[in-house]
Curated annotation (Swiss-Prot):
The lineage of its organism: Eukaryota, Metazoa, Ecdysozoa, Arthropoda, Hexapoda. GO terms for cellular component: cytosol. L-methionine binds at E81, Q124, D269, K300. It catalyses: L-methionine + ATP + H2O = S-adenosyl-L-methionine + phosphate + diphosphate. K(+) binds at E68. This is S-adenosylmethionine synthase. It comes from Drosophila melanogaster. Mg(2+) binds at E34. It is an enzyme of class 2 (transferase).
Length: 408
């Protein structure tokens, strides 16, 4: 049973909700995270939704976008609410995105040239618009909905991300690189990876010791044998991506454990925007408020406040104020100020929770109108966020730790 703690207490291997799971220093535990490739049907929908968002922001930085995508065999459906001055060729944006992913022939289960693109897009509700942003100064723009958002950071990797999810993403990135370069001529766009690491619990910190299990499942042509596929993936992906120091004789590797994976993408499973929220964030570490990111402009705090919370958490860790950090913020629709801000340090900080909160309040303004300015969220940057995780990657403003004003 979870043991209740305050935000500053130690003894928690994960502490997803501020609770701890009663673990002694020196104990070891296993933790697993997964990632999905660009051609996974849900991730394909995320990319399309964010491509639509970017297309609007390129012409209208103040566009209000909430675009969901559904994918099934031979069909893409866009649905949602968009209020924008932009003139967007939805057919073109969708087809170019699908082509980039790699679905360019019906033999792969989907073809950007022949798929049917359906639209069910309305204007944003005038009631929401009136209560959130109409006739308001930028700094007074309200949250587009109620909700809770979390940001997490850990010092176990240079990226301040959990090693499990970092490695899972890197496996998928390597697969896509080899597919696009034709080294894996037989590979198709759909793939999934999963990494289990053994951790040592040390005074609230989670210290990765070794990789326990690796799972890779990837869509492939019928012209390659499973034996050859497994050998190729082992030699050119697993052994290249996973640092040798984490691999030992007991590490388990499963490559296409189900066998054949010729039928993939939307032909194998229906896809939907926002169904890979753990892949998009921390791989199960920290916590998640439930709101998805893709297809949403900055007024949707599901996205912007989650980015800001990550910025806060990473800044605290990079400043040496704690080794692990979880930040929660909450909002009410139409109100600019967050309702609550909470920080958990898992017992890894020399500061009290009150001191950490004071540092956050002194250094960060978490109103949506300030977040958009500080993180430059009106730019068309979102399609790149929609694969391999929104956090822990260079080139995004929320990954640049802020120098903090701290009273010693």
């Amino acid at each position: 049973m979870p043991q209740k703690t305050n935000g500053h207490s130690a003894n928690g291997c994960n502490g997803s909700n501020g609770n701890s799971y009663d673990m002694e220093d020196g104990a070891t535990f296993l933790f697993t995270s997964e990632s999905v490739g660009e051609g996974h049907p849900d991730k394909m929908c995320d990319q399309i939704s964010d491509a639509i968002l970017d297309a609007h922001l390129k012409q209208d930085p103040n566009a209000k976008v909430a675009c969901e995508t559904v994918a099934k065999t031979g069909m893409i459906l866009l649905c949602g609410e968009i209020t924008s001055k932009a003139v967007v060729d939805y057919q073109k944006v969708v087809r170019e995105t699908v082509q980039h992913i790699g679905y360019d022939d019906s033999s792969k289960g989907f073809d950007f040239k022949t798929c049917n693109v359906l639209l069910a897009l309305d204007q944003q509700s005038p009631e929401i618009a009136a209560g959130v942003h109409v006739n308001r100064a930028e700094e007074e723009i309200g949250a587009g909905d109620q909700g809770i958002m979390f940001g997490y950071a850990t010092d176990e990797t240079e990226e301040c991300m959990p090693l499990t999810v970092v490695l899972a993403h890197k496996l998928n990135e390597k697969i896509a690189e080899l597919r696009r370069s034709d080294v894996f001529w037989w590979a198709r766009p759909d793939s999934k990876t999963q990494v289990t690491c053994e951790y040592l619990f040390n005074q609230g910190s989670a210290v990765p010791k070794r990789v326990h299990t690796i799972v890779v499942s990837m869509q492939h042509s019928e012209k390659i044998s499973l034996e050859t596929l497994r050998s190729e993936v082992m030699e050119k992906v697993v052994k290249v991506v996973i640092p040798a120091k984490y691999i030992d004789a007991n590490t388990i590797v499963h490559i296409n454990p189900c066998g054949l994976f010729v039928i993939g993408g939307p032909m194998g499973d229906a896809g939907l925007t926002g169904r890979k929220i753990i892949v998009d964030t921390y791989g199960g570490w920290g916590a998640h408020g439930g709101g998805a990111f893709s297809g949403k402009d900055f007024t949707k705090v599901d996205r912007s406040a989650a980015y800001a919370a990550r910025w806060v958490a990473k800044s605290l860790v990079k400043a040496g104020l704690c080794k692990r950090c979880l930040v929660q913020v909450s909002y009410a629709i139409g109100l600019a100020e967050p309702l609550s801000i909470t920080v958990f340090d898992y017992g890894t900080s020399h500061k009290s929770q009150k001191e950490l909160l004071d540092i956050i309040r002194r250094n960060f303004d978490l109103r949506p109108g300030k977040i958009v300015k500080d993180l430059n969220l009106r730019q068309p940057i979102y399609q790149r966020t929609s694969t391999y995780g929104h956090f822990g990657r260079a080139g995004f403003s929320w990954e640049e730790a802020k120098p903090l004003e701290i009273d010693n």
